[in-house]
Amino acid sequence: LSRLILLDIYENMFHNEFPNAMEIMHLTKNQISEMIEMGHSIGTHTHSHISIGSSYLEENELNFEIIQPKTYLETIFKIKSEFMSYPFGQTVDCLSSKELIIKTDSYKLAFTVEEILNKKSTSPYELGRYMPTSLDTSELLYKKMVSMINGK
């Protein structure tokens, strides 16, 4: 249901006001190809940017959200796509390691949006990440890393 609501908002409000939103917000096939040629690994981020863990998706909806983007990347670009980043990162928004493996068995790593220090004991399906912004400097990033290491 949340996916349908989000898609309705997108199609009936956002897309009407910004008809070229897809070109602005998403990478083109050429941009993705260039990134692959430069050596980047390409992962997925779900199809419609919903909270996977709290949406109570049917199996076909879960496949559409998690598996379809992976299949698309692998088919179009002839690559292995084994990583995903949850659109939202609170615990309620993510599948547990066990759930992700049982429901898809398709990924090796999954990233939340929690700013945590990843350790050897961190599940590969619940990795933290830091989302830098255009305002970040190397000094600010260093301070953030020190803060994360110190558990603050």
Over which residues does each language-model region extend?
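Sequence-level motif detector for i,i+2 pairs with an aromatic at +2
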Residues: E37-I42, T122-Y125
